[in-house]
Amino acid sequence: MKPDSLEHLVLQTESNGFRYYLSTDCPHSSDGVIADLVAGRVQPEIWFKQTRRRHIMSHDGLLIKLYQFHGFSDVRHSRRYASREVECYHDYLKAFGSMPGVRLPKLYGYFEKPFLGFLYRANGIIEEYIPDTRILGMEELSLVPPLFAHLYRKGIYHPDMQFQNVLWQPKTRTLVPIDYMGCNILFEPNWEALLMQLSWFLHAADVDDAHARPFMEEVLSLLPELRLDHEKAWSCIKALYEIPVETHQYHHPIFLPPELRRRTQPDD
């Protein structure tokens, strides 16, 4: 069943047991190419991932993520995948708004292959493919702090804010954040969420402290309203390096481990 928040997506077609809900500006929305790609009748221009459960492909301006579920244990958890991801995607785009030097891929659609009425044999999302992007290099790292400040002020929590999930398009000098699975809109700034996202980003970037700490300090300097002690904030980020991500990544509401919170919380 199409998520309630995606009322702007229209049931465009049904093919091979799949229902395709697409936006009016989705390329190939009416020529059958998307259904052919999902069914394997057309080979995509680029394969990014091809496993038993997950296919990620790009074709003519589209990025398609297909999740396939095998056996009942897979099927009963199927709602955690594309249906959840597409809702997160929609909420993220709506809350983020716009920002100079940052481009978010458009959300073009969602598709599903229902099973027993409320589960899925497969589902997936369709988004805009932004070409000529790559992983950030050290020389672009200094361009990212304003993005963190923007996420903080918009109350956006991105639990997979990894270094590899912020791409760089050299031709336009544009940052492209991707992969919004699990994103939550907190409706108000949250300093704990900010530090957790900084920790994951810097740890995944594998930069030394001589580059990582100035990065954090630049983010905090852009947020004068956030009265965090820089030494305490840095100590918190370093401590989070040692905690397995899954133990605190998806907590709702967002919070740090209690001892870290007590040691780090902003001055009144």
Specify the residue positions occupied by each region the protein language model found.
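ATP-binding glycine-rich loop module of kinase domains
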Residues: 21-24, 35-90
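Catalytic-loop of the protein kinase fold
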Residues: 153-163, 168
